[in-house]
């Protein structure tokens, strides 16, 4: 990958601007999950250890450009960052036209989405960002799919543009999973709708050996195979598409295994009575809310024999205890597997947390939309810009 890495650069005495993803949930001025802040600390520490004058910026929420509001301020983040780094981290409010910072110091530059032109990747703004630094470091994989002034434009104009450790770890893990995977490569793609993950399914079916589908997506594939799905969430208009994906898989010698048993209920409620049924016994008023134990065991065996596992989405309504067992079985199979495993997507990360398997998954992507777009085979604007500068 032709990207200059921050870890390879001499940063002594250099002004370094780092774009991090510090977009954390804040409730009444209190940070409710600091995972992204914690993740950014090693990169900032490394820049300080290398003798740089460090400027860090990030977006937070969706503020109106050109206006400052307290709820969109990075002030709580600056406080927490200072505690984690053990150094002062002043917050600089008006920073576009110049920042005072000395080698060995770090400042946090206020929410970059407050700057006029940030969202539209304005060239004038991007050039101003670039003028602040000797080296620009893109370390926010979660925003790498957005072409904005702080994630794309600045890369074109900075004297040197590099990928930070977090971004490079993410790209390295994804490349290992998709470009050069240990075989067999198994992907789990689940979600409510085929339509939202159509590009993902179409791209993965060209790469994988097995593709496990779950949730509402699986219901559409079940219906496409000629089975009744009752009142379950599915997309009848996408049955031809599902059939095409199955045909494409067959042509490649890949497999899309379907459930043989499912867990159903009459109502979509946490305390609805759950029944395990064979796939061909689903009634007209049934809702399929999870895979059955027999299917979960079969999928777990496929995971156990995989060389690489890519996991995006829980296979049932895992928030409801009665319909969580399929997702739990697969999560535990991934945790105990020797395969290279990568998990990503909001609901997937919630399942990883629920079953406490983070330490047993090789790589957990915090990229969200960027992770999905990478899996879809799309070029991420920030990555493309870094590659162009690395030539």
UniProtKB/Swiss-Prot annotation:
Keyword terms, alphabetized: ATP-binding, Cytoplasm, Glycolysis, Kinase, Nucleotide-binding, Transferase
UniProt family annotation: Belongs to the phosphoglycerate kinase family.
EC number: 2.7.2.3
Quaternary structure note: Monomer.
Gene: pgk
Binding site for ATP: 197, 319, 345-348
Protein name, UniProt field: Phosphoglycerate kinase
Pathway assigned in UniProt: Carbohydrate degradation; glycolysis; pyruvate from D-glyceraldehyde 3-phosphate: step 2/5
GO molecular function, a single term: phosphoglycerate kinase activity
Location, primary (coarse class): cytoplasm
Gene Ontology annotations for the cellular component aspect, listed alphabetically: cytosol
Taxonomic placement: Bacteria, Pseudomonadati, Pseudomonadota, Gammaproteobacteria, Lysobacterales
Binding positions for substrate per the UniProt entry: 21-23, 36, 59-62, 113, 146
Catalysis performed (reactions): (2R)-3-phosphoglycerate + ATP = (2R)-3-phospho-glyceroyl phosphate + ADP
Compartments where located: Cytoplasm
One annotated GO biological process: gluconeogenesis
PROSITE patterns assigned: PGLYCERATE_KINASE (PS00111)
